[in-house]
Structure formats: structure tokens, C-alpha cells
Amino acid sequence: SVVGEMGMYPLEEAVKLAESFSTRLFVHSTNPPGTMDELVSYLRKGDVLCHMYHGEGENILGKNGITPGIQKARERGVIFDVSQGQGNFSIPIAMEAIKEGFLPDTISTDLNIENWNHPYIFSLLLTMSKLMAMGMSFEEVIRRVTSTAAEIYGEAGKMGTLAEGTCADITILECQQKEVLFRDKYHNELIGNSLLMPMATIIDGQLFY
């Protein structure tokens, strides 16, 4: 754990700080200093648990599936985000959680300057394609990167929609039917049969790509 012997103390203080600024908290949950149930017990409605499908240390699965604390956290409004990253995603854990119906609220990549070209992650579309290979539908995946994300972050009706009068930020995709091999840092592999590819990007009504 990155917090070492400090345990949950940094998280407790972070929650207090977030409350003082009336803002939400984003929490890196990989390899937590305690159980995931303990970690999410500190989180409030609107706080975001990142790396929800990580496989390092304690995770969201217990002996009987999704742990009770994780279920309760979702019920009280904690947001669960994929935040895949280079090493914060386990294919078996994600597949089991999705099988149980524990889908992400939002889908993001955790891309940064060090992992932007890594084969495990590479792009948001690759992450979306991977989740489709695990059982999520195209519509479920699209909502979690558009309208649902906009609603959670207070931009409903402004972003993540094609409604008349809204900002025309649009990505045109093609769902190519082909065999795709997905991997994670633990050397787990998954074969999918479709890959989302970008065909055009429109920004504020202007063709960009």
C-alpha cells in the first residue's frame, strides 16, 4: 500500500478536506491498507472510487461475490469508475463483477504520459471494447462515457447528448467485428469479437479528424 503504516488516516483527512471545500473525493483504491469495505465506509454520496476492478490486495469481491460494504456504498451514492490504467484492472475480477451485475457508473482510462501507448490500455475505445467482451452491451458502455458521466458531474443536458442546441462534440465510431485479444498486468487474457474504432471527431461543430 502506498500509505504504509498510516492506514486509513490519509483517507480520513482527505474526506475532511473535501468536506471543507464542499467537493467530491476521488480515491485510488488499488492495494488498500485494509479491506475494500472499510475503505468505502469513509466515502460519501458523490465520492468516486477509482480502479473498481483492480486485483492488487483486497478487492470488491469476497467469498460470496460483491462484498456487502461495496453494495451498501453503491446504494448510498458512491460512484464506481473503471479508471483502468496500466495495472489497475483485473480481467477475472471485472468479469465476475459484471456477471453479478455490478457494472461501472462511469468508464475512464487513467491514461497518462507514462502509459498512453501501453497495450493493456491504449485508449478509451479499447477499454470500452474490453468491457463489451465481458458482457456489457454497446448501449451500456456508450451511456457510461456520455450521458451518465455528464449527469454525475453536473453537465446533464449540456454534454453527453445530441439534443438540439447543445455543444456538438461528437465521435463517430465503427464497431468492427474481429477477434481481439485483451490482456491485463497479471497475464490474464480475454478474447473478444468486436473492436470500437474512431472514424471521425467533431469538436464544437467542426470536423477535427
Provide a role label for each language-model segment.
Residues 45, 164, 204:
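Short glycine-rich loop/turn motifs that provide flexible caps or phosphate-binding loops at active sites
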Residues 1-118:
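Active-site core of metal-dependent hydrolases
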Residues 167-209:
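C-terminal cap of metal-dependent C-N hydrolases
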Residues 8-9, 64, 88, 122, ...:
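Residue-level recognition of alpha-helix initiation/capping sites
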Residues 55, 86, 147, 176, ...:
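Short, solvent-exposed coil/turn elements at secondary-structure transition points
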Residues 92-176:
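His/Asp/Glu-enriched, well-ordered alpha-helical/loop segment
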Residues 38-43, 71-82, 126-135, 156-160, ...:
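Short secondary-structure transition/capping segments
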